[in-house]
Amino acid sequence: MRFALVAAITIALLVAGSVADESSEDIDNIVIKTPLDLPRCDSPFCSLFRIGLCGDKCTCVPLPIFGLCVPDV
């Protein structure tokens, strides 16, 4: 998980750097989404019987015994 996060940030920075080299005027239009920009769920776990535990911006993904709250992207 940590390797994927570091790889995603590195690629995003490389892309931003190559775009900035082409035109310094377009640097204001670049938006880089990071995991910190994702909405946070009210709870990490949920139940199919009480779906509202995740919050408004998250969805309950069912597993055999319990569910996981996943942010809506």
UniProtKB/Swiss-Prot annotation:
Residue ranges annotated as propeptide are 21-37
GO MF terms here are: sodium channel regulator activity; toxin activity
Q: Does the keyword Secreted apply?
A: yes
UniProt signal peptide: 1-20
State the disulfide connectivity. Answer: 41-58, 46-60, 54-69
Report the sequence similarity comment from the record: Belongs to the gympietide family.
Its UniProt domain note says:
The presence of a 'disulfide through disulfide knot' structurally defines this protein as a knottin.
Report the protein's function. Neurotoxin certainly responsible for the defensive, persistent, and painful stings of the giant stinging tree. Inhibits inactivation of Nav1.7/SCN9A sodium channel in sensory neurons by directly interacting with TMEM233, a newly described Nav-interacting protein. Has virtually no effect on Nav1.7/SCN9A function in heterologous expression systems and in neurons that do not express TMEM233. Also weakly but significantly affects Nav1.8/SCN10A. Coexpression of TMEM233 with Nav also confers ExTxA sensitivity to Nav1.1-Nav1.6.
Identification of the protein by name? Excelsatoxin A
- Organism equals Dendrocnide excelsa
Native organism taxonomy: Eukaryota, Viridiplantae, Streptophyta, Embryophyta, Tracheophyta
